[in-house]
Amino acid sequence: MALDAKEIPGVLRGLKWEPRAIDDRTWRSTLQTGVGVVRVVVRHAGAWLYLSIIPFFEPGSIDRWGAGTYPIGFLGRLLAVNRNLNMVKFALDDDGDVVLKSELPTENLQASEVAEAVSQLLKTAEQYRQPVRDALLEAGRAAPPS
């Protein structure tokens, strides 16, 4: 039996999170990690459960970049990183900001799968936040915004 939207807050609390409801299908948690504060949004959208670190970078840490404006070559580097990732991927949100996300089909979804996706999100954020930020700033020094 699949997890329904009403069960998601309990799963997150079981991971020692304090989810705050945005609406009846969306929750946000703010976590302190080894690379600073991480904001995770979890949305149950019927057939899919979306887990996202939004924004991926700490506010103010990437200066003039974001909102769809990135130096030439940076997004290609981000796609190259995606090839090495399992269960999570970098993407751009509707505002053009970099996010890290995981998408799980809700059919037969188990709490352990949510826990694994959360683990991968946090592990990837800790591994890649600084190197990806450095790559963005390095590309920015070499090229104007695209």
Model regions: which residues?
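Short, highly charged C-terminal tails/helix-capping segments
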Residues: R133-S146
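Charge-rich, low-complexity N-terminal segments
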Residues: M1-R39, D93
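Hydrophobic residues embedded in beta-strands of well-ordered beta-sheets
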Residues: T26-W27, A47-L49, D97-V98
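Short, internal acidic amphipathic alpha-helical interface segments
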Residues: S52-V99
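Ampiphathic alpha-helical segments that act as solvent-exposed interaction surfaces
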Residues: G73-L85, Q110-A135
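Long, continuous compositionally biased terminal/linker segments
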Residues: T33-S61
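A generic structural motif
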Residues: F57-S61, L104-E113
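Ordered, soluble secondary-structure elements with a strong preference for glycine-centered loop motifs
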Residues: A2, G68-T69, N108-A115
